[in-house]
Regions:
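Conserved, structured C-terminal
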Residues: 1-269
Length: 269
C-alpha cells in the first residue's frame, strides 16, 4: 500500500475510548442551538456559534432535578439536512437528559420524532441509507460521493478499491473507465415510488431502480432516489417509474431536494 502524505510526514498519534452502552439522541431543527443553549452549564452562545457542522465537544447540562449531567459528547450534525446536534449520553442519564430538553423547550418547540420522520428528512436532504442506497458493491463515484475522496488519496492511491475508483473518476472520453450507473434524485408524479421500483425510458426499457422513495412533507411532492444508466442522469431528464404495474412520469432532479441548513458560521437561510 502506498503511504499517504500524512503518513509520510509522521502524523500525530490518535487515542480513542470506546463508550460502551451509551445512548444517542438527535436534536434537530432551526431551534436546536437555542434549546441546547438554554440548559448548558457553561455560557452557550459563544460556544455554539464556534461549533461548526462536523465538530464535537463534551458539554454538561442542567438536569430537571437540579443536578448537573455527566459530560455529554455533542456533535454538530445529523441525518436530516437541518442544523442540529447528535448527543451521546451515558445509559443511566439518557431518559433524564431527553426529558430535560423536552420540558425546557415545551411541545410547541420540541417533540419526539420516529424513524419515519427521520427517513423522510434524510431523503429530502439527499442522504443515503446504507443497505438501500449504498452497499459494499457501490463505489463513491457511482453514488455521487466523489467529494469524500481527498486530493491526497487521488494522487497516491493505495486505499481499498483505489484501482477501480480512480479509474471511474476519469471519464471514458479521457481514457478512464467512467461508470455504468449513477445515483440520482427523482420527482415522481402520482403515487410515491418505493424501493425496488423500476426506472424505464420512453421505450419501456429498464434503465435503473429506485432505492428509496416517499412523499415529501416539505415539498408536497413524491421524491425518490435511485440508480440510473449513465447518460440518463442529467437533471431535467424525463423518465418513467413502474409503480404497481403502472408507469408514472418522473423527472431527474438535483439533490438535495430541500436545501441543507448546516451551521457553517453564518445563519442558515
Amino acid at each position: 500500500m502506498v503511504p499517504t502524505k500524512h503518513q509520510k510526514e509522521g502524523g500525530a498519534k490518535v487515542e480513542w475510548e470506546v463508550l460502551e452502552g451509551w445512548g444517542l439522541i438527535a436534536l434537530q431543527g432551526p431551534l436546536s442551538a437555542d434549546i441546547l443553549g438554554r440548559v448548558m452549564v457553561e455560557p452557550a452562545e459563544s460556544e455554539l456559534k464556534e461549533m461548526y457542522f462536523g465538530s464535537s465537544k463534551f458539554v454538561k447540562i442542567k438536569l430537571l432535578n437540579g443536578e448537573v449531567s455527566s459530560p455529554l459528547l455533542v456533535s454538530r450534525g445529523g441525518y436530516t439536512g437541518e442544523d442540529g446536534f447528535e448527543i451521546s449520553i451515558p445509559e443511566s442519564e439518557a431518559v433524564v437528559v431527553t426529558e430535560t430538553l423536552l420540558q425546557n423547550a415545551g411541545p410547541e418547540q420540541l417533540q419526539l420524532a420516529g424513524l419515519g420522520a427521520r427517513d423522510s428528512l434524510r431523503l429530502e436532504a439527499g442522504m443515503c441509507l446504507y443497505g438501500h442506497d449504498l452497499d459494499d458493491s457501490t463505489t463513491p463515484v457511482e453514488a455521487a460521493l466523489s467529494w469524500v475522496i481527498g486530493k491526497d488519496r487521488r494522487e497516491t492511491g493505495g486505499f481499498h478499491g483505489s484501482e477501480i475508483i480512480l479509474s471511474q473518476l476519469k471519464p471514458k472520453s479521457k481514457g478512464g473507465a467512467g461508470v455504468e450507473r449513477r445515483r440520482i434524485g427523482l420527482i415522481v408524479e402520482g403515487a410515491p415510488a418505493r424501493e425496488g421500483a423500476e426506472i424505464v425510458n420512453d421505450k419501456g426499457e429498464k434503465i435503473g431502480n429506485i432505492t428509496s422513495g416517499c412523499p415529501s412533507p416539505t415539498l408536497g411532492k413524491n421524491v425518490a432516489m435511485g440508480y440510473i444508466k449513465d447518460g440518463f442522469h442529467k437533471s431535467g431528464t424525463d423518465v418513467e417509474v413502474v409503480i404497481r404495474g403502472k408507469k408514472r412520469k418522473a423527472k431527474v432532479t438535483k439533490m438535495p431536494f430541500v436545501p441543507s441548513k448546516y451551521w457553517k458560521g453564518t445563519a442558515p437561510s
